Design a protein with these regions (language model features):
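Cell-envelope and extracellular/periplasmic
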Residues: 1-357
Length: 357
């Protein structure tokens, strides 16, 4: 039964009756539903990072974690038991999960990005928020594709995660999809930029088709670094995908290379941890995109600096970037393994600087 579209609000009751039966539903709320998909950095629990744990132990954190204005469906144990688990390869039409309100216990094991994002939507735009969290760690983009669907040179041949975590919600009216994935395709499938760009653009187009919305908002993260592993092919594929999407309205990508932290920070730093802790920054950048595109917030900045051109002047190369605000150059200690003042000759490579910055 489609009840149509209701204005943002809450605490409604619904009564359905017939001659022989009566059903009553209470505590109904209407708001904006966002789907959070991808792999472990999207799934990453709030209690898994230091700042998240500290927040949960404060009076203010506990207060914000108890609200009926944010509801969630957490699919972490439904339909797909980890990256290596077996699953029925047919669409899952029904699920036994239900919307739950936030409580401190539930918040601890929800997606940190989803937590910060939903709090931001609630506070900035006074909207009720529904979270559908479907991310699974260590998963490839192929697993999120409908089996047999193609885009460019890419064809999906798995369909497991799509069938069990995406398809069940395609009849649900949603506000948009937030995506953080690519690490597994960097270190395992070794996709090149062209292959991943086809897969990424195709995924966006297909999900919009499945939700019957040609401009369904879809925003995603461009990978940051992990140690010295070269993820530049996936990052470039993510960038090129923006050009291949059929309808470019309400599609966006942002980078994270500027929040890597110092090289010697250890756990939680993207230099040494594939799960960097700065999830609030990730959520803020998602918020800027949806704030600008969906909630028409003129103050929201949707992108970091985007490379435009280069020019060689004597012994200097001048790079030009497009950006809405003022640019700031980080100190070398923030992006170099070690500072090397020696000039690089034309025939040598300076190995003291981290690869593919």
């Amino acid at each position: 039964i489609n009840l149509g579209v209701f204005e943002n609000g809450g605490n409604y009751e619904l009564l359905i009756s017939s001659e022989n039966e009566k059903l009553e539903f209470a505590n109904i709320t209407f708001g904006d539903i966002w789907v959070f998909a991808g792999q472990s950095n999207m799934e990453f629990y709030l209690c898994g990072e230091k700042s998240g744990n500290e927040l949960l132990n404060t009076k203010e954190g506990k207060k914000k974690s108890t609200t009926d204005k944010i509801r969630m469906i957490n699919m972490y144990n439904i339909g797909y038991m980890g990256a290596a688990g077996e699953v029925e390869n047919v669409p899952l039409n029904d699920w036994n999960e239900y919307w739950t309100e936030l409580t401190p216990d539930r918040v601890s094991y929800m997606s940190a990005i989803a937590y910060y994002f939903s709090q931001g939507i609630k506070d900035r735009y006074d909207r009720n928020v529904g979270i559908i969290s479907v991310a699974v760690g260590d998963t490839e983009i192929n697993q999120w594709y409908p089996r047999g669907e193609s885009f460019g040179k890419f064809t999906g041949d798995s369909g497991k995660l799509y069938n069990n975590r995406i398809y069940p919600f395609t009849k649900q009216k949603i506000k948009g999809i937030l995506w953080y994935q690519g690490e597994a395709d960097n270190y395992r499938t070794n996709m090149n930029a062209e292959e991943y760009s086809d897969a990424m653009a195709g995924l966006i187009d297909l999900y919009r088709q499945k939700w019957s919305s040609e401009d369904l908002p879809f925003y995603y993260v461009q990978l940051t670094r992990y140690e010295t592993k070269d993820a530049s092919e996936i990052r470039e594929g993510q960038r090129i995908a923006l050009q291949k999407v059929r309808n470019k309205k309400n599609v966006g990508m942002f980078g994270l290379l500027d929040i890597i932290g110092r090289y010697d920070q250890g756990e939680g730093c993207a230099r040494t941890d594939i799960h960097p802790w700065q999830k609030e920054v990730v959520a803020d950048r998602f918020l800027d995109y949806v704030g600008h595109d969906i909630y028409k917030d003129s103050e929201a900045n949707t992108s970091g600096p985007v490379y435009q051109s280069k020019q060689k002047i004597d012994n200097t190369i001048v790079l030009t970037f497009k950006h809405k605000g003022k640019l700031k150059v980080m100190d070398k200690s923030q992006y170099a393994d070690s500072v090397c003042e020696q000039k690089i000759s034309a025939s040598s490579t300076d190995t003291s600087i981290l690869h593919e910055f």
